[in-house]
């Protein structure tokens, strides 16, 4: 029989446990580390094996080589105790309270495992309120992966980050670095302009001189004419600065003289790159007069369509949302019954992904509205085959569970659901007797629905999306005609206006925002199913047909996914 090496995972662990017991009983210890007057007995060989810092100290010709006591400066006794526990046990508890001391100490003593654990912990704690501070902390301690992760987080969540105290405390050069970045993800330049203005006003006396320089990096020509005239022109800080007025005039000229745009090209006239976003169109009612399971993906950069794996169950009247790199296909109608089942696609750019089932809703729902708020999915209304619902339920993907929430005032199917400023809006729909123009708003903090100003037109099967802090409602059916009209709701003024009509009437149409523009996807025009996609540019208040899918459909689920 040939000899064979046998390895056991428990051997190294048992040695560490024995060494730790010896340390705690001060047995065979040959070095004492003194920190803030507290002595920590230890074994040179263990310290040297875990730390390049101690290895150099005990094996080179440093003064500490022959000493039995070593003073360690630059960390606290409590931190030293945590680090020694790691050396002897290979475990460390990183907390919000200790990480700011633990990471610098781990860097000082060159304990790579603790440094990595601290970086992983801080990465998991990234939030709009702390990402800028974590980025600076990571840069100070040469944690390059964490620094990059924090930068990407601040770019992805720019609109939220600039509302935090950390942003207000940045230096002028740090603000400039952030707003000039091509990769910040914003639907328009409005939050960029407002971020600069708010930063200046936070300390106007000292910061006002920086305003013209910072506005150089705001892409004002890409703002809507209405925003330029109503907001920017009315701002006193802009009106009293000639360099700022010059930038505003450039933006106005860009709109008033479109024939000169080719001569005005500069970084200010180029859209930010942001993340690579793709549009998914899922299921629906197809040309065979039945529900379909086809999933198509549109890349706006290449203007090309491709197919993804089909959903497991054919569905029309389906609701779809994207959340944390996953796509959820919710409820619908399979041709026989309304569904409570939910399918999920875990999607990455280099893989097609696989559909799998998650927890079913508490209620069967077709033509329900769906949206996301925070890390939760909300679904409201819909038709179960016998009645329309007022109910709303929420899905928590962390525990794979649905829970019921407060009922709407009106039962609705075919209504749109969208989040704006932390509130959930439900718009239009059909109550079983009438097509509706009413709008309700849900406050997650109070759990109550309240009515707001209704739409000008009754609409069911309309597309709903949020663009530049305004809710757009496109197309739908009013009981008589299939609509091409578009209404816009200002959440600040509780007021509705109209913008340019779509090129084609569309009912059971999907709507979403992609790279700062509003897309209306497929639908039914009153005569035939559509495969065309049109796009609305709010800067010039105009729609254009940009592409067509391979599949004619209505009642489809649509969402935008950011590719990694």
UniProtKB/Swiss-Prot annotation:
Mind listing the UniProt keywords for this protein, alphabetically? Cytoplasmic vesicle, Developmental protein, ER-Golgi transport, Kelch repeat, Repeat, Transport, Ubl conjugation pathway, Wnt signaling pathway
Q: Which InterPro entries does the entry link to?
A: BACK, BTB-kelch_protein, BTB/POZ_dom, Kelch-typ_b-propeller, Kelch_1, SKP1/BTB/POZ_sf
Q: What pathway does the annotation place this protein in?
A: Protein modification; protein ubiquitination
Instruction: Tell me which residues make up the BACK domain.
Output: 131-232
Gene3D superfamilies registered for this protein in UniProt: 1.25.40.420, Kelch-type beta propeller, Potassium Channel Kv1.1, Chain A
The record's listing under Pfam families reads:
BACK, BTB, Kelch_KLHDC2_KLHL20_DRC7
Q: Which residues form the BTB domain?
A: 29-96
This protein's record includes keyword Transport: yes
Query: Mind telling me which GO cellular component terms the entry cites?
Result: COPII vesicle coat; COPII-coated ER to Golgi transport vesicle; Cul3-RING ubiquitin ligase complex; cytoplasm
Task: List this protein's GO terms for biological process.
Answer: anterior/posterior pattern specification; convergent extension involved in axis elongation; COPII vesicle coating; endoplasmic reticulum to Golgi vesicle-mediated transport; neural crest cell development; neural crest formation; proteasome-mediated ubiquitin-dependent protein catabolic process; protein monoubiquitination
A GO MF annotation of the entry reads: ubiquitin-like ligase-substrate adaptor activity
> Main site of residence?
cytoplasm
Kelch repeat residues: 278-325, 327-375, 376-422, 423-469, 471-516, 518-563
Location of this chain's protein in the cell: Cytoplasmic vesicle, COPII-coated vesicle
Q: Which PANTHER family does the UniProt record give?
A: KELCH PROTEIN, KELCH-LIKE PROTEIN 12
Q: What does this protein do?
A: Substrate-specific adapter of a BCR (BTB-CUL3-RBX1) E3 ubiquitin ligase complex that acts as a negative regulator of Wnt signaling pathway and ER-Golgi transport. The BCR(KLHL12) complex is involved in ER-Golgi transport by regulating the size of COPII coats, thereby playing a key role in collagen export, which is required for embryonic stem (ES) cells division. Negatively regulates the Wnt signaling pathway, possibly via the targeted ubiquitination and subsequent proteolysis of dvl2 and dvl3. Regulates convergent-extension movements during early embryonic development.
Subunit and partners? Component of the BCR(KLHL12) E3 ubiquitin ligase complex.
Name-wise, this protein is: Kelch-like protein 12
